[in-house]
């Protein structure tokens, strides 16, 4: 069976991506990164998703981006209730580049020629590393920088959610049997994975379920 490394954050998008990769016949190797994120319960969610969706292996890599800083997700910076103009403070500098590079390294080790990530350019928070141009550029890099690329096997970077709305992602996940109740999206999630209901991630997630006409399985700490 062909193999793929899938970035798994523990959120709803990456859970849907695993299911989509499996539907395409890939044996999934899920990679999560403990990068110093304040909402560490997403890693607990990643473990739940990996177990529930039957991945071949789930690896958690430690890369402490707090030493670099520059984000409300790693530093002592308040997470805003809503996104504003420009790139938000929840952007983690070069995060997707770093994570995809780690996934690329593991792909070489396990013999996978395909990487999957859950980046989205429709209902998203304005991060530069979620754009189609970034995904295409990273695929070029992957083929220039690896043994598989140089030897002609070719590496592909898949972003199957790139042009889907959050509602579309919910519908696809439901179609594929994804249990979104296992996932955590909130930037302020507590240790038990309960969501704040107010941050940008929570608002996008709630709107996705509402627009899809699907009951929201999110566990909230605060309702208002």
UniProtKB/Swiss-Prot annotation:
Residue sites binding Zn(2+) per the record: 186, 196, 199, 202
Enzyme Commission number(s) of this protein: 6.3.4.20
Pathway: Purine metabolism; 7-cyano-7-deazaguanine biosynthesis
UniProt-listed Pfam families: QueC
GO MF terms held by the record: ATP binding; ligase activity, forming carbon-nitrogen bonds; zinc ion binding
Keyword line: ATP-binding, Ligase, Metal-binding, Nucleotide-binding, Queuosine biosynthesis, Zinc
Residues that coordinate or bind ATP: 8-18
One of the protein's GO biological processes: queuosine biosynthetic process
Reactions the enzyme catalyzes: 7-carboxy-7-deazaguanine + NH4(+) + ATP = 7-cyano-7-deazaguanine + ADP + phosphate + H2O + H(+)
Cofactor: binding comment: Binds 1 zinc ion per subunit.
Known cofactor(s): Zn(2+)
NCBIfam families per the UniProt record, alphabetical: 7-cyano-7-deazaguanine synthase QueC
Family designation: Belongs to the QueC family.
Role this protein plays: Catalyzes the ATP-dependent conversion of 7-carboxy-7-deazaguanine (CDG) to 7-cyano-7-deazaguanine (preQ(0)).
Name of the protein described by the UniProt record: 7-cyano-7-deazaguanine synthase
């Amino acid at each position: 069976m062909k193999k793929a490394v899938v970035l798994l954050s523990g959120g709803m998008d990456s859970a849907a991506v695993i299911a989509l990769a499996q539907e395409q016949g890939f044996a999934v190797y899920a990679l999560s990164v403990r990068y110093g994120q304040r909402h560490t319960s997403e890693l607990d969610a990643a473990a739940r998703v990996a177990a529930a969706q039957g991945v071949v292996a789930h690896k958690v890599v430690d890369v402490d981006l707090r030493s670099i800083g520059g984000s409300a997700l790693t530093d002592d910076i308040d997470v805003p209730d809503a996104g504003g103009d420009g790139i938000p403070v929840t952007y983690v500098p070069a995060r997707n580049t770093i994570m995809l590079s780690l996934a690329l390294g593991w792909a070489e080790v396990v013999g996978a020629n395909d990487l999957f990530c859950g980046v989205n350019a429709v209902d998203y928070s304005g991060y530069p590393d979620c754009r189609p141009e970034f995904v295409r550029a990273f695929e070029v890099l992957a083929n220039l920088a690896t043994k598989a690329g140089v030897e002609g096997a070719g590496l592909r970077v898949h972003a199957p959610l790139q042009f889907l709305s959050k509602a579309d992602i919910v519908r696809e996940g439901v179609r594929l049997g994804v249990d979104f109740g296992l996932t955590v999206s909130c930037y302020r999630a507590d240790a038990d994975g309960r969501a704040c209901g107010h941050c940008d991630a929570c608002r996008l997630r709630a709107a996705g379920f509402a627009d899809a006409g699907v009951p929201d399985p999110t566990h909230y700490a605060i309702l208002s």
